Amino acid sequence: ADGIACRTVETFEAFGLAQTLIDEAYWVNETTFWRPDAEHRGDIVRTGRVQDVEDGLSEFPHVIVNQARIHDYLLGFMARSRTRLAPDYGLEFDSLTVDREAEYPVTVTLRETEGGALRTVRARYVVGCDGARSGVRKSIGRTLSGDAAGHAWGVLDVLAVSDFPDWRFKSAIQSSEAGSILLIPREGGNLVRVYVDLGTVDDENRTRVRGLSREEITETANRVLHPYSIDVKETVWWSIYEVAQRLTDGFDDVAGRSAGDANA
């Protein structure tokens, strides 16, 4: 994710990366809240403005910086370390078995994405950070339960002109009928990320929602923002994703653990 909590910035300080990070990032100092106007329900009005990070929580700010940049920072730290550690690319998880009596109980089979050759790795532990369709989670016998229907969001990083007063603040906006928006300014002082509520997704409408264009998502955003608007000059990146209300029935085994989106 592109949002980095202040306590996570503290962790980056241990790697000597915090100052570089906060010099480049957008600082989320305040958050504003907008709701439907009580007298004109089709319009929105500001209803609140709060400090984003409570006093005394951290010496560092909550910041926004592109995930690829964080990746670059960490790769640079690894390259300068004593071991000159480097990640392996072009491998995908194939299978996992556990022999509880062995010194290295975990045996993981990896498949090369080019050519399909298999590699075997033996270890004491394995941590699966392989996303919502986690192969590690399945291999340690864990399953997901919860609501099969997800909630869809359109997300755009845009260069745009807007008369919305809080365009350069993190803003949570709820309209009476058109849905919701979360605005998060990006680093650099020009781009803004726009999260647009696209509603509940099920088997009947999933294809239609996933097929929405960026122009249609922008139209929805403008309906939410009324009486304000955005005029998008350039969209540098956009996507549609779903958030499901699910949770795994367990996070770990004797020698295996799932983490992050692999648990949801």
Predicted feature descriptions by range:
Residues 91, 110-115:
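Flavin (primarily FAD) cofactor-binding/catalytic cores of flavoenzymes
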Residues 74, 128, 235, 242-264:
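Conserved mid-domain beta->alpha element of the FAD-binding
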Residues 76, 125, 129-244:
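Conserved FAD-binding catalytic core of PHBH/FMO-like flavoproteins
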Residues 89-106, 241:
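A conserved short coil-to-beta-strand element within the FAD-binding core of flavoproteins
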Residues 103-108, 166-168:
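Short, hydrophobic/aromatic-rich segments at coil-to-beta transitions
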Residues 114-125, 129:
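Core beta-strand elements of the Rossmann-like FAD/NAD(P) dinucleotide-binding domain
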Residues 3-81, 88-90, 99, 175, ...:
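Active-site-adjacent segment of FAD-dependent monooxygenases/related oxidoreductases
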Residues 38, 70, 101-103, 115, ...:
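Short strand-connecting beta-turns/loops that link adjacent beta-strands
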